[in-house]
Each structure stands twice: as C-alpha cells, then as structure tokens.
C-alpha cells in the first residue's frame, strides 16, 4: 500500500463528507441564482403588466366632450395625446394660444391636444361648457378637442385623473395647478408629465412630442 493510498483511506469518510458539502454549496448557490433570476423576471413582468393595465384603463375611461357626447381616449387610439387641465381665468390661460399652435403644427402627424376644463384651482373656471366653448373659440380660435368640466384632484377627482396621478401611474402625484400636461404615446402609455410653467413651445416638450410622433 502506498503512502498516498494510506492517506486516502485515512481521509475516507471525512473527505467524502467534505466533497458532499462542497457539492451542496454549489447546488445551493445555483439554486439561489436561479431563484433570484426568476424573482427579477417576475418583478419585471409585473411592472410591464401594470403599465399595460394602466394604459388599457386610460383608453376605456368614459368621458364626455364639451358638447356632451360620450367618448373615450380609445376613440383616439394610435394618436399621440397631450392631456391638459385648462381654465379660462388663470394666469396661464394664455397657453391656449400655444396649445392651439402646437396642435395645428402636428395634428397631421398624429398629435391631439385635449383640453379638460376644471374649477379646482382658485375657482378659475366658473363657466359652464357652453361658456367655455365660446370663450375658447372667440378668444383663441381653439380647434383642438375640448371636454366637459371635471375634477382633477381630491374627492371629486375624475377617473381619468385618478389613473393619471394615482400610485400605479407612470408619474404619480396630484396635479398642482391649471395647465398641467400629460403626454401619452400611440400605444396609450403616459411617457411624460409637465407642470403649468412648461409652455407649449418649450423645446423639451416639443422634442418629446416629435419623438413620440416619429418625426
């Protein structure tokens, strides 16, 4: 019997146990890596599913245009939408002019500007739908789609704005003032949000619109 064989025989049970432990450790590491990868994939899939669900919800929410006709964002499927909460007696009311210019510039490429009057901020939209429509036409020659008055915050928040600003939204958080803006791509996904101070001709806003349009 050689010295090496003697050592091997002496180590027998301990060596086998050590080898078994190493094998188990390797298997445990592989199992952990596999479980981690699976969990990451599940989280990613969940995020994608949530995003798709929010987009689908936006498309289906019942709305009324400013004339009282039933509609949904789904009626504008395949378009790029700029959703704006508007008011007639606000310091930002002048943005109607820029929004109309933006609409006329890009409407043939698929942009739809959407005005949603609300009276939530300083009671700056006291008019009814007829008065709002007349004001927008006479003062700014607005031709982009306008909708019935709705709430954008608090207990009276419309389901559209609940979806746009809720915890599962792409850009959660309450609208702070009139002329807040949400940009929705052709698939129905909200891709950008802008506050009241962002003018319709803002370079960043225009560039994002052009990218969404594929210009």
Spell out what each predicted region is.
Residues 1-26:
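N-terminal amphipathic/basic-hydrophobic helices that include classical n-h-c signal peptides
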Residues 21-40:
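N-terminal secretory signal peptides and thylakoid transit peptides that target proteins
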Residues 92-158:
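Structural microenvironment flanking redox-active thiols in thiol-disulfide oxidoreductases
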């Amino acid at each position: 019997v050689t010295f090496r064989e003697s050592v091997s025989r002496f180590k027998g049970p301990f060596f086998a146990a050590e080898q078994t432990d190493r094998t188990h450790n390797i298997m445990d590491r592989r199992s952990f890596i596999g479980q981690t990868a699976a969990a990451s994939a599940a989280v990613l899939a969940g995020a994608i599913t949530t995003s798709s669900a929010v987009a689908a919800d936006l498309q289906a929410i019942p709305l009324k245009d400013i004339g009282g006709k039933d509609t949904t964002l789904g009626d504008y499927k395949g378009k790029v939408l700029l959703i704006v909460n508007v008011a007639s007696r606000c310091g930002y009311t002048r943005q109607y002019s820029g929004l109309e210019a933006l609409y006329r510039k890009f409407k043939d490429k698929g942009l739809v500007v959407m005005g949603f009057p609300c009276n939530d901020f300083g009671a700056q939209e006291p008019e009814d739908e007829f008065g709002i429509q007349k004001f927008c036409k006479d003062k700014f020659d607005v031709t982009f789609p306008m909708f019935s008055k709705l709430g954008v915050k608090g207990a009276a928040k419309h389901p559209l704005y609940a979806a746009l600003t809720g915890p599962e939204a792409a850009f959660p958080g309450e609208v702070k003032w009139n002329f807040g803006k949400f940009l929705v791509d052709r698939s129905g996904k909200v891709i950008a949000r802008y506050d009241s101070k962002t003018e319709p001709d803002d370079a960043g806003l225009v560039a994002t619109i052009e990218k969404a349009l594929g210009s």
